[in-house]
A protein has these predicted regions:
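Conserved alpha/beta enzyme-core scaffold
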Residues: 2-555
């Protein structure tokens, strides 16, 4: 007979609520400071000192645009003898105090996605041994890990308004807040939200109060950056030429109707060419209808001209609030009229829901691997790796996706267009197409297990330079891909790998196209082709609804 199961001794029985008990203990330590869930502004620093433990994993809301800066400034003032060696999870390192935490020893380890404004200082702190990098992630990768192996102990986030029950209204810049809060709250972590004000009735509830432990009114409105605003005054004739070639040789050729534009003047030029050059080609209604995109001011002329059907946004953009409210057929807005942005959902849309990602890069090697990480500058990638790859889980077909089928087989699959834009030389005459990415050396020096590559070459389908377009997906074998890229690399070291005869062969086979092959006249490619040539022009296009930040005003 089988023996009866033996119950484990009570002493060996596991405890199943340790995280909840630990949270209750921490909350009890600060209960005397709070009125319900409301912490007084003056008590925040004291509360953080009581809530945090050495080595805690802290998710700090430094997003692309909005920053929980009252929380980060207060955190940076804590006594490192009591709170130290924190593991910081932050999507965008944007503010000086984010790195003050490492200089003071309050934080030790960092997992992040983007560090544009602070990239030089990040590199220096790594070199000095003050900062350890776990990994440079794409946005959704970092948030995914918050649900798996980087679960936060504490989350420090920001919102526009709260009520006395802790319900949050995030307004146009929802961005990453719901994801960070959910990952923390439902693993019995502590969530503190700084808000601009506490009011009786919220315009809408974006995050329920049952997910929030404390709200605190900040000493000033949370910081927000107009990260995606590009002044058309700075778009060059060369960028206009590249934009015209991209429209003719990619957008029109494949009928790209759903897309994401990366940040930069290259893509801003394309947005401003749609109502002029695109209109002259009869492309309205055929391309660029549905977007996963922040509300770029440079998209205003295309919207006003009837090109755009919808825009789902990662975040908002300073000054675009009134314009968005006045265009509810285009943007995702709530009953209150304000934008509902969501970075994770928009990244998902940009990964699986669009036909094309197109964006700029700082450096590319001969295999089309690209990175924004260069010597002395650890920038990170943001969302580019997520949207700039071919998601092999995709199963729905669109005309653009199907056109990239190259195999002749009963079982075939289409492919997402992944387009990289770069001028062959950076400012100062430094080649942008190089034998080896700086990222390889940066990764080695920083002790990273792999080089911090932004977009891997085998995901890139097209490369656009001022010389022309390389249709890499058509290549038969790695060497032919390298030759096609070299054909548009100008007089860089990569460009010198092929001779004129080989370039002509590639042109004849459709792997390379120059401006003349596309019917684009370089003489026509100048700033007069842009629908708006200044911020003032964008304001005029918007009917005065766009209110640019002061730094972009010249009137």
């Amino acid at each position: 007979m089988p023996s009866e199961p033996v119950a484990p001794p009570c002493a060996q029985a596991p405890r199943w609520a340790r995280r909840g008990a630990a949270k209750a203990e921490r909350l009890g330590a600060v209960a005397h400071l709070a009125d319900g869930c409301v912490l007084p502004t003056r008590s925040l620093e004291q509360a953080l000192g009581l809530l945090l433990r050495p080595g805690d994993r802290v998710a700090l809301e430094g997003n692309n645009q909005k920053q929980a800066d009252f929380l980060s400034r207060s955190l940076a003032r804590l006594d490192p003898a009591r709170v130290h060696d924190l593991h910081l999870l932050i999507s965008s390192i944007s503010r000086p105090e984010h790195l003050d935490l490492f200089e003071r020893g309050i934080a030790r380890r960092l997992d992040f996605s983007f560090a544009g404004p602070q990239s030089l200082r990040v590199a220096q702190l790594i070199e000095d041994g003050r900062l350890e990098v776990g990994a440079i992630h794409t946005y959704v990768e970092l948030y995914a890990r918050m649900l798996i192996d980087l679960q936060p102990d504490v989350a420090l986030v920001c919102a526009d308004k709260a009520d006395a029950q802790g319900n949050l209204y995030t307004g146009p810049n929802t961005e990453d807040t719901p994801t960070i809060v959910e990952a923390t709250a439902f693993r019995q972590g502590i969530v503190i939200a700084q808000v601009n004000e506490i009011c009786g009735e919220l315009p809408r509830v974006d995050i329920p109060g049952s997910w929030i432990d404390f709200v605190v009114v900040a000493d000033r409105p949370f910081a927000i950056e107009p990260l995606f605003t590009r002044d058309p005054r700075h778009i060059t004739d060369l960028q206009v030429l590249m934009g015209m070639m991209a429209i003719r040789g990619i957008y029109e050729r494949y009928g790209v109707s759903s897309l994401n534009h990366g940040i930069g003047f290259d893509t801003a030029a394309i947005e401003l060419l749609l109502p002029t050059y695109g209109e002259s080609l009869g492309l309205k209604g055929k391309i660029c209808r549905n977007w996963a995109l922040n509300p770029h001011p440079t998209l205003i002329p295309a919207i006003e001209s009837g090109w755009v059907e919808s825009v789902h946004c990662f975040g908002s953009e300073v000054g675009m609030e009134r314009y968005i409210e006045a265009r509810p057929d285009i943007f995702f807005v709530g009953r209150d009229g304000s934008l509902r942005s969501n970075r994770v959902l928009c990244q998902l849309a940009g990964q699986y829901g669009v036909d094309m990602f197109i964006g700029s890069t700082l450096q590319m090697d001969g295999d089309a691997n690209s990175s924004t990480v260069t010597l002395g500058r650890l920038t990170g990638f943001g969302g580019a790796p997520n949207m700039g790859h071919d998601p092999r889980g995709r199963r729905h077909a669109t005309p653009a996706w199907l056109q990239l089928i190259t195999a002749d087989s009963p079982v075939v699959r289409g492919r997402k267009l992944v387009v990289q834009l770069l001028e062959t030389f950076q400012s100062g005459g430094v080649p942008a197409l190089v034998e080896s990415l700086d990222a390889v050396e940066v990764g080695r020096r920083s002790g990273m297990p792999i080089a911090p590559v932004m977009i891997y070459g085998d995901d890139v389908t097209h490369v656009v330079t001022e010389e022309g377009i390389a249709y890499l997906y058509k290549a038969q074998g790695q060497q032919e891909r390298r030759d096609a890229l070299a054909a548009v690399a100008g007089v860089t070291p990569i460009g010198q790998r092929v001779n004129a005869q080989r370039v002509e062969q590639l042109r004849q086979r459709g792997l390379v196209a120059f401006a003349s092959d596309l019917g684009v006249s370089p003489l026509q490619a100048n700033r007069s082709m842009l629908a708006a040539r200044s911020i003032e022009d964008l304001v005029a296009w918007s009917g005065g609804l766009y209110e640019p930040p002061a730094r972009f005003r010249s009137w």
